[in-house]
Amino acid sequence: MRTIGLDVHKRFAEVAILTSGASPARRRIATTPAALRAFAATLGPQDQVVLEATMNTWAIAELLAARVGHLVVSNPLRTRAIADAKIKTDKVDALTLAQLLAADFIPPVWIPDPPTRALRRAVSGRAALVRQRTQLRNRIHGVLHRNLVDAPVSDLFGRAGQRWLSELALPAAEREEVAAGLRLLAPVDAEISRAEGRLAQGALADPRVALLMSIPGVGSACALGLIAVIGRIERFARPAKLVSYLGLDPKVRQSGERPAHTGAISRQGAAHARGVLIEAAHTAVRTPGPLRAFFGRVKARRGEQKAVVAVARKLVVLTWHLLSRGEPYRWAPATLVRTKRRALERAAGIPARRTRIGGSLSARERQQQERAILQGAEAAYRELVSARRERADAAAATGRDDEGQRPKMRGGAPSPRLRSSLRGQAASGGEA
């Protein structure tokens, strides 16, 4: 069996081949389809190949995977932590990868299937267009700020806002900068609409999107972004694995007999997914329900910013439960879910249709009824947390936990059972 490491670059890849009982063989191949197919023809089912995740990794992996018995894509950050070296060349890197794979030390990356890769490209393409639009809008805002001008409209880039901008009296150079920004915005807005239309058509056919959109604050963009990053939910055995994968788990530092120190979130994984989760959390806490109650509880102790991050983490836990069970969020407001669905249909180009919802209640009455139910759930959450806190305080005062056991002290710290009791376990399963 041969073990082959590839250090991949834009135009070439350095190859190191390990064979039992022989010196390593080295070669360089071009990263063109023809050269890669010729290299793949020299491989067999007894070979195993490793390469690091880069921009062109997936195309190379797709060409080689059918010819070898085992192909691994490694995580560059974790590989560097395992095999950092003073001498770093392409040949050394390729050989190091092969040696790590032979020793079974490679931290692998999941190789997404073609539909997931296509969704990732579509989501990242839309995100890039949105960033371009934001830059253009910020340039126009900068012109107004430099000239001490306040816009009289709430939507500066709507029809009324653009008409006001075109008539605004400014110095010639500043006026031309605003006009150029508006001219550039038009095609970018059109491309964003087309990209969102294509994404919406795929989202309507994906039942996972409907499940995630049942969560308050989670729209189609957030749902698609999460699905693109997650792929198959079966990859994650429990919610904590998904939280860690998205970089919302806290950093932990512990050495010797010192207690563990928990710091800020790790920020590993997909930054775009964390961004849309934070945006969704800001929206979710404005809707009555257990999520808003949870936000208020954390905000009172840790401040608003940390509370928003805690809600984002809770959204990830909810995502794991909903996708694993195939069930919508229990406290999903039906009217809000229908509104999200209709917005998705409009983006996909589906014409409006008149539907009649059963019952004698008007739309406003249904919304008020749903709001009352959610406010009741929010109040029930607060009562649950308050009752558990009272039990924890009583247990701490008597020196016994909820099961009547006297806790064992370890170096001045309470036992895990008492720590669990003192925390109160305020979060309920996958519901908040």
PLM regions with names:
Residues M1-A432:
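A detector of single, family-specific signature residues
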